[in-house]
Amino acid sequence: MLTSRSGLGTPCVHKPFLLMSFSLLILSMVVTGLLIGSFLTVVVDRVPQGGSVNTPPSRCGSCGLRLGPLDLVPIVSWLALRGKCRRCRASIGIAPMVIEPATAALFVLMAIRFDDTRAAIPAYCILVAVLVAQTWIDLQTQRLPREITYWGIGLGAVALAVAAIVIDEPERIWMMGLGGAIALLTMWLIYTLSRGGMGDGDVRLAPLLGMYLGWLNPGIVLPGLFFGFIAGAVVGVAMMAIDRAGRRTAVPFGPFLALGTIVAIFIGQHFVDLVLAR
């Protein structure tokens, strides 16, 4: 067995899927990320309006043209059509050109981060998909749909539990639960003390973020939230400085929580070690 270089300190259990070469792994993450990103463009368009992601088939929002396979190739179709419907030439919107490559890039980063603990890659790709969708929706509508959060918690918990069993570290299951509880309690206290200064969608999102960070180490949950608050504060101050936001202007916080979580996945343990060493 190989010793993990991912920072988890766990052995990598070899299964056929886990023996894939690194270059092939990265290629598969790019392709999978683009396909999932294409699906997420449907999610961010329909879920905020209460629609189904399954039906009806994708159509042009202007002329109703049903989109065929050639209209749905990630990135390529958008570029070939120059961001317009091939029949009525109405704008398709920029979402595909942001969401699809962003999802693919983050999938690749997760593959690199968990290269020697590959059983965790599917779980953290689920997190990426949820965070990309919620970030886009929050920026557009200042809402974090509970359906996406709950699906993320359910699927993520199962995927993380499976990963813990595959790497033969079942204790990570309770670590996951502890991380979720820490994040939920922390955000609930902030929500209560701020008297509405934070949305309840942020509170619902907290256990999802906490369980993923807790699976790595419950000690990095608070740093992850801290990174998010710092990023949010910096942007909020910058917006006020350029007169784009007043003190009571609502600033979507979900994207900053997402950013803080991603940062903590990569450097959270190093941050904790640095603080404890001082």
State where each predicted segment sits:
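Alpha-helical membrane-inserting segments
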Residues: L40, V44, L106, M110-F114, ...
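Long, highly hydrophobic alpha-helical transmembrane signal-anchor segments
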Residues: P11-P48
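Functional transmembrane core segments of multi-pass inner-membrane proteins
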Residues: A133-A233, V272-R278
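Interfacial loop-to-transmembrane junctions
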Residues: V237-V263
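Intramembrane alpha-helical segments
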Residues: R89-V166
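Helix-coil boundary and interhelical linker segments in multi-pass alpha-helical membrane proteins
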Residues: C12-I26, V108-P122, A161-M175, L213-I220, ...
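Hydrophobic alpha-helical transmembrane segments
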Residues: I26-V31, M97-P101, I121-C125, Y150-W151, ...
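Membrane-proximal soluble regions of multi-pass membrane proteins
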Residues: L40-A95
